[in-house]
């Protein structure tokens, strides 16, 4: 069983989706660009994980997820070593539309992803991190079904 950390921003559809995750550590983030990254790095420095799955919401998607392949800070970009194609396949097999994206945004999500990837690259290169954008709750037709299937994908990754 893989040791997984799942992060989600407080008071978002991401937080609602991760409720009920078992056998993984959950880190809820306060929606503060600086504090979010600091809290993640503090957690990573105190405990080793095989995988970090960060979840944030994106306003312009409906009933699907975007699996982010990279994060950017200015002219720098860092790609993930997580198998994003496999993750897209797992979501689709669970009945959730998914696509690869190379745009983690320009604010909280991207900032967390960039600094998380940078920390892992420098301090824990064997660990993998991926960022998944989910819709706002109002943009998910059947939220409970979406949540159950989303948790099924996380459970599959845990058990690899």
PLM segments and residue spans:
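Short active-site-adjacent structural elements
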Residues: 138-142
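Buried hydrophobic packing segments
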Residues: 112-116
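An accessory alpha-helical subdomain
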Residues: 133-136
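N-terminal catalytic or cofactor-binding beta/alpha core of small enzyme domains
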Residues: 1-106, 117-128, 144-148, 157-159
């Amino acid at each position: 069983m893989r040791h997984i950390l799942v992060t989600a921003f407080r008071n978002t559809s991401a937080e609602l989706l991760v409720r009920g995750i078992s056998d993984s550590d959950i880190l809820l983030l306060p929606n503060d660009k600086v504090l979010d990254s600091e809290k993640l790095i503090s957690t990573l420095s105190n405990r080793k994980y095989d995988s970090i799955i960060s979840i944030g919401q994106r306003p312009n998607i409906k009933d699907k997820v975007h699996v982010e392949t990279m994060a950017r800070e200015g002219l720098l970009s860092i790609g993930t070593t997580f198998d994003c194609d496999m993750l897209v396949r797992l979501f689709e097999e669970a009945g959730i539309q998914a696509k690869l994206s190379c745009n983690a945004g320009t604010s909280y999500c991207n900032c967390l992803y960039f600094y998380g990837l940078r920390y892992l690259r420098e301090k824990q290169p064997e660990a993998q991190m991926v960022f998944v954008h989910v819709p706002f709750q109002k943009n998910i037709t059947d939220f409970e079904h979406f949540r159950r299937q989303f948790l099924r994908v996380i459970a599959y990754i845990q058990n690899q």
